[in-house]
């Protein structure tokens, strides 16, 4: 036990895209095996060498390379550096904290960034928002939050059988992913005040070219590709 370490009894952990990458190790995220994945978890403090956390505290950790270079949440107990932990708000249970998990945290950051655009541009209203990778965790929660903000949300998916699901979440329009997998124009027609992109690659390049002047893009994923072929023209 090192100075500042905290031992946590894990209650819940979520399953994320990065966990799949870690299991495959195609992205070379793990240096050696055996390894315990799980990039987030919630639980109770069982032992603490930190003045910030005491026995019985409910805590949450997300990302911070947990489950990557540090042992992850798919375990009964985890020893973690205290600076990576946050105390769980009392308004949410440990279970619900991980139902939202890293995907929920990420989608909220994206949604709040788009909402903040209205304040940055002196109240100019955001209307049309595009969400790619819409049936994934980040995309699904982003649709719910953005629609609650009153935005006209367009969801991008390659799964035609998920149209009803996306409409229930709050999407007003559905776009076939293939429409954004074509060679992007340098400057397309301005369609979007905001974009939440979880895909990357050519889909993000097309979303950039279709974003209105003064628009905002929250790019948070690379499910399709880490590469981005674009120009300075849309900026």
Give the ranges of each region predicted by the language model:
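Glycine-rich beta-strand-centered segment in the early N-terminal region that forms part
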Residues: 1-14, 26-66
């Amino acid at each position: 036990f090192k100075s500042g370490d905290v031992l946590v009894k894990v209650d819940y952990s979520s399953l994320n895209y990065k966990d799949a990458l870690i299991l495959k190790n195609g992205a070379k995220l793990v240096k050696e095996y055996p390894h315990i994945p799980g990039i987030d978890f919630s639980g109770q403090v069982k032992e603490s060498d930190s003045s910030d956390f005491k026995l019985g505290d409910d805590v949450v950790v997300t990302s911070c390379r947990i489950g990557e270079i540090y042992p992850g949440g798919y375990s009964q107990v985890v020893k973690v550096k205290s600076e990576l932990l946050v105390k769980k708000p009392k308004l949410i249970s440990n279970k619900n904290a991980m139902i939202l998990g890293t995907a929920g945290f990420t989608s909220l950051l994206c949604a709040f960034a788009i909402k903040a655009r209205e304040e940055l541009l002196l109240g100019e209203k955001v209307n049309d928002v595009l969400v790619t990778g819409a049936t994934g965790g980040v995309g699904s929660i982003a649709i719910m939050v953005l629609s609650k903000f009153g935005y006209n949300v367009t969801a991008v998916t390659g799964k035609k059988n998920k149209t009803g699901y996306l409409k229930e979440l709050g999407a007003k329009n559905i776009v076939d992913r293939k429409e954004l997998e074509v060679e992007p124009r340098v400057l397309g027609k301005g369609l979007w005040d905001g974009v939440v992109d979880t895909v990357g690659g050519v889909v993000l390049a097309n979303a950039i070219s279709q974003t209105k002047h003064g628009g905002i893009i929250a790019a948070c994923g690379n499910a399709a590709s880490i590469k981005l072929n674009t120009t300075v023209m849309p900026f």
